C-alpha cells in the first residue's frame, strides 16, 4: 500500500497532461505482472489536511517528504501552480478533487 493523497492524484493528473499529453491520473488499485502484484492507494481520495488532523488526534507523527529534490522538482512546481489557482477560489480545490474522483471511479481498465 502507498500513501498517495488527493493532492498527489491531482498533481499527477496535471503532470501527465503537461509533460506527456495524456489524460491520466493514478488508480486507487492497480495490478501488475499479470495480476501477481497488486498496488493499493487507500488514501488517494483523502486530502492531506484530513490525514494530518487524524494524525494529530491519534498522536501519530507527521513528516514531510525527506527527498532532497522534493521542493525543487516539476511536481513541486505543479503543486505551487495548483495552490495559486485554488487560492483565488476556495471551491475550485473541492471541484478539482471531485472531478478527478468521479473520473477515477468511472474509469475501468
Which positions does each model-derived feature cover?
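Generic structural signal for secondary-structure transition and capping sites
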Residues: 22-23, 60, 90, 105
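C-terminal-of-GTPase-core extension/linker across diverse P-loop GTPases
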Residues: 100-104
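Cys/His-rich short segments
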Residues: 109
Amino acid at each position: 500500500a502507498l500513501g498517495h493523497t488527493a493532492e498527489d492524484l491531482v498533481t499527477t493528473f496535471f503532470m501527465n497532461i503537461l509533460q506527456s499529453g495524456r489524460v491520466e491520473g493514478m488508480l486507487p488499485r492497480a495490478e501488475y505482472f499479470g495480476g501477481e502484484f497488486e498496488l493499493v492507494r487507500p488514501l488517494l481520495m483523502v486530502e492531506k489536511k484530513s490525514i494530518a488532523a487524524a494524525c494529530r488526534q491519534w498522536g501519530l507523527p507527521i513528516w514531510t517528504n525527506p527527498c532532497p529534490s522534493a521542493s525543487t522538482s516539476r511536481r513541486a512546481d505543479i503543486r505551487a501552480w495548483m495552490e495559486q489557482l485554488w487560492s483565488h477560489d476556495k471551491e475550485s480545490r473541492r471541484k478539482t478533487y471531485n472531478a478527478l474522483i468521479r473520473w477515477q471511479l468511472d474509469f475501468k481498465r
